[in-house]
Amino acid sequence: SYAPGLKCIALENIPEFASIARIAFEKAAHNPIDLRTGNYKELLPRALEDMGKVDFVFFNTIYEQQNNVWLFNECTKHIHNDTIFVFEGIKTSRKMREFWKEVCAHPEVTVTVDLYSMGIVFFNRKLHKLSDYIVYF
């Protein structure tokens, strides 16, 4: 096991994708992954309650544009100093670029890294927010 005691919850709202994910998790995961299928607005509050504080959250924001602000706000209620968020598809549309700007401006966010196809967000108070980092390939 890579991380003994690791607790991982994955949420998927499309049953067909959940079936594929379940197979992949069973083959590759060294720790059991709690895969929950259904509406994010119903699943997320309970998942966050079960987790307490979150260490890492991956947002598949391309397909959930209508829920991005809500998902982000709910998850930020459960951060700690070492929490990291990763957002997929931050440049895929004007709406996503605007959402990414909102994330970068959030008062709890200390550092952001823009990798064009995804964005990484840190909440660590030891990191000083001098600017947002943009990486060009």
Tell where the protein language model's regions lie, with residue ranges.
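S-adenosylmethionine/decaboxylated-SAM
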Residues: 1-137
